[in-house]
């Protein structure tokens, strides 16, 4: 699997779960798409959290739907990161690293320092992925931090009421 070939996920019901492995992905040397003002996914100062293998997925987000995406590494000591972005329709031209702009991009990674009111464990959660009037497609990136190239994980996509 190359980094620009996301795997389709069919959402079923209120919650969809899949399993994966970082070894199924590939490194992404150009991360500048992430801190471009047209995407604003994560700042360049946080790029070390996204330097490992990237495994990409995508799914259809119907109108008037909001989802929360949770990444759960099998190894509680593994350092993984997560991002998700919305586009009209997934194509080679808007799949990272070729992403020039998107509707919304959110990311989560291990925090460099403690944040008041937030306890962090090995899980990563991306919120606020939503469609109002228009449906979108959402690309999910599961990434190893610090160059990590392997490790099993589970992804959970849950509809938010």
Residue ranges and their predicted role:
Residues 1-11, 23, 27-28, 32-161:
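Acidic, Ser/Thr/Pro-rich low-complexity intrinsically disordered segments
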Residues 19-21:
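Short amphipathic
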């Amino acid at each position: 699997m190359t980094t620009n070939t996301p795997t389709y996920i069919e959402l079923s019901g209120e919650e969809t779960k899949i399993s994966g492995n970082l070894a199924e992905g590939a490194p992404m040397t150009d991360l500048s798409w992430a801190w471009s003002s047209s995407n604003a996914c994560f700042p360049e100062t946080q790029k070390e959290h996204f330097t490992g293998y990237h495994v990409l997925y995508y799914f259809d987000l119907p109108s008037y739907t909001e989802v929360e995406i949770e990444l759960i590494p099998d190894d509680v000591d593994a350092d993984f990161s997560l991002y998700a972005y919305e586009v009209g329709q997934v194509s080679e031209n808007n799949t990272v690293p070729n992403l020039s702009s998107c509707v919304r991009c959110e990311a989560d990674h291990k925090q460099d320092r403690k944040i008041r009111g937030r306890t962090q464990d090995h899980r990563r959660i991306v919120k606020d992925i939503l469609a109002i009037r228009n449906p979108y497609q959402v690309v999910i990136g599961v990434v190893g931090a610090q160059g990590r190239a392997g490790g099993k994980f589970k992804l959970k996509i849950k509809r938010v009421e």
